[in-house]
Amino acid sequence: MSSKGQQLAIDYKQTEWKTPDVYNQLRGLMKDEVEIYAFCLEFLMNIEKDSTLFHSALSYVNEKDFSQLVKIAIDILKEKESAVAESVIEYAGIQLPHILHPYLDDLLVLNPNGDSYFADYHWRNCTSAQLQPYLAQFLASSTDLETKIKLFNCLVESRDITTIESLIPHALELELSTYVSSAHYIDGYLEGVGLCREYGKVKRYCSDQTYHILFEPKYLNKPSAVHLNRTDHPTWNGVPLTNKYKVGGYLAEDENNPFMHIITLNPIPEGLPIRLSQLVLGCHLRELNENGVVFYQHDEQGNPHKIGEPIVIEWVEEHAMVPTEVSIVPTDSRWAFQSWASANSRENLFRIGGEPSWVQSGEVLTCPISGEKMQFIMQLDSEVPDVQGGEVYYGSGGLCYIFWCDKTKVSGYIMQHT
């Protein structure tokens, strides 16, 4: 007799999304580690067509069982192509990259997920010792250019600064891209993984400490879309810190270009590179969506003052978020890195600290006063309710990224969307 999880996968194989109440059936398994693993195992072993239902389920598989799925997926890929097995590698690389580290050689040969943006995610957090053989292969004169480019991408994805600084002088001598210079290629790749070059050194532009912002469930949820329920995923849950933070509303109303309040950080969450006792973050969202970037300098009380005169925006009419209070929760290590596309609207991408979840490529702001690279401090997702009954969108529904220069007390905003 099949278990509930196994049976759901069997049913899905027959009728796919016509399976009665399929997502609610999956929701019923999410807190049962045995059943969610049974579902994923049956899906991996016996279903050829990949599915977001399977992707959703992987977030609830414990590390031990995920390691077993990885082993099976690699064995499958050694025998045949499998989009489902490739998804196991993709999501393990995002959530638990260390469980893939014993298979680095196999994965280089198999190259699951091909040239996709997430193909090398599993190299994240490899140690210098683990990387040494691959660095040596990259440096070897006998290694062909195509292999060197692949190894460069993998080694940078590790985020190991010692290895990367050994890599860069040699990478600069290669034709890494036919579209941009090698220097631009290197800088672009670094900024996509939380790093940047400044004054000849590689450094992180984001903090290690990460928090997720938690709203009251009814503030964000759309009851008609069960698969987008913003209470299920682990990133929408957790034990919050005691402090509450005010978000939304206006700092200054202007019919042409209102100054919208984002959040007041009081106190400043631990681990952020901010020496003020409080920081009021706000932006002219219409101008941000029209021009792509805005900057503010803050006074000693943390209040923002726009750098440059506000401009009249005629064609964009965004409104402020509905005022509310939010909590923050320290992020579990499994969710320290999140991919915007792979999250697929299931995960909480309202984050403070940590690495950005870039919609496009990395784009670290330079402070307009100090001329130095700024530190990433926060990101906001779209589809927050606004005061006019609509929703706040960054572009067509992307993310807003907030940067900070502590030397000059300047905040900067950019947004990316598809």
Segment roles from a protein language model:
Residues 1-418:
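Preference for intrinsically disordered or flexible, low-complexity segments
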